[in-house]
Amino acid sequence: MGLTEAEAIEKYGKSEIKTYNSTFVNLWYGTFSDMEPSDKPKTRMKMICQGEEERVVGLHVVGMAADEMLQGFGVAVKMGATKAHFDDCVALHPTAAEEFVTMAPWGMSKRVY
């Protein structure tokens, strides 16, 4: 949802864009002990931020329940949430969505509330 990385660079310029990425196996697949780890589908997430305040202009997920994750975060993005806002949230564990609020470098934003 929001801008892709390419769209954000085109709109704001490369120097204004910072991306955060994560790839992991969804915890749901932990119950499948008969599957090889390499066979378990990966979830990929990307957060695209703009400017010094790192306003979130794009969130992207490929993986299980991506639609459910993005629905809630959509409100935050529309309201102008920053990476620091995401960093300041308590992660609901165990969920895949928690990755957005613990995305490395977690807590390293210039301004955590």
Sequence positions of predicted segments:
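Flexible, glycine-rich terminal cap/loop adjacent to redox cofactors
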Residues: 1-4, 9-113
